[in-house]
Curated annotation (Swiss-Prot):
It comes from the Eukaryota. It comes from Dictyostelium discoideum. NCBIfam families: small_GTP. One of its GO terms (biological process) is vesicle-mediated transport. It is a lipid-anchor. GO terms for cellular component: lipid droplet; plasma membrane. A lipid is attached at residue 196 (S-geranylgeranyl cysteine). A motif (Effector region) lies at residues 36-44. Keywords: Cell membrane, GTP-binding, Lipoprotein, Membrane, Nucleotide-binding, Prenylation. It is found in: Cell membrane. Belongs to the small GTPase superfamily. Rab family. This is Ras-related protein RabG1.
Length: 196
């Protein structure tokens, strides 16, 4: 595997939206224990995936609580191929701040970096405050995939990371495979629209 086979992916978003839980659920689903997640203990984890018969190493970076202190710097974004912008579906403020995170990607990220909007904690249906159709509309305007996940139950977690990997593959390697995502917990899959 050479450097071109490594995709650097960042998890960003407000504190306590579940970024570390998503990372741990994806990279080690058999040993995931929600109570064991320590928000300041993870820098990055690796996971190998296959796209079109080719193996890629996803190097997934977590902010490890730095976002609470607004200490995320341009060095964190350096070399990133993709960014999962996460919010908590039960916390409207975390969704409202997504635009600020998108601005930060624009300010510090590589031109053309792939992005996926992720609404986490979709298992908390009775506490949900952010309507998926609003988030989908915003993602459509940006021309990026949107997906709701639950790190607790594992719903759509792998799909979110694979949508990110597919976006990177298409944008940076030249693959033609469109991202197919199941945006909302329990909804049928859909192909990402191309927005002009």
């Amino acid at each position: 595997m050479n450097d071109s086979d490594v995709f650097k992916i960042l998890l960003i978003g407000d504190s306590a939206v579940g970024k570390t839980s998503l990372l741990l659920r994806f990279t080690d689903p058999n040993n995931f224990q929600e109570t064991s997640v320590n928000m300041t203990s993870v820098d990055y984890k690796n996971k190998n995936i296959t796209i079109d018969g080719r193996t890629f190493n996803l190097q997934i970076w977590d902010t490890a609580g730095q976002e609470r202190f607004r200490t995320i710097t341009s060095s964190f974004y350096r070399g990133a191929h993709g960014v999962l912008v996460c919010y908590d579906v039960t916390d409207q403020l975390t969704y409202n701040n997504v635009g600020l995170w998108m601005q930060e990607i624009q300010r510090y990220g590589v031109l053309g970096v792939s992005r996926v909007l992720v609404g986490n904690k979709c298992d908390l249906e009775d506490r949900k405050l952010v309507n998926a159709s609003i988030a989908q509309e915003y993602a459509d305007i940006l021309g990026i995939p949107f997906i709701e996940t639950s790190a607790t139950t594992g719903v759509n977690v792998e799909e979110a990371f694979m949508a990110m990997a597919d976006e990177i593959y298409r944008n940076h390697i030249g693959g033609s495979k469109p991202s197919v995502v199941k945006p909302v917990c329990g909804s049928p899959p859909r192909t990402k629209k191309n927005i002009c």
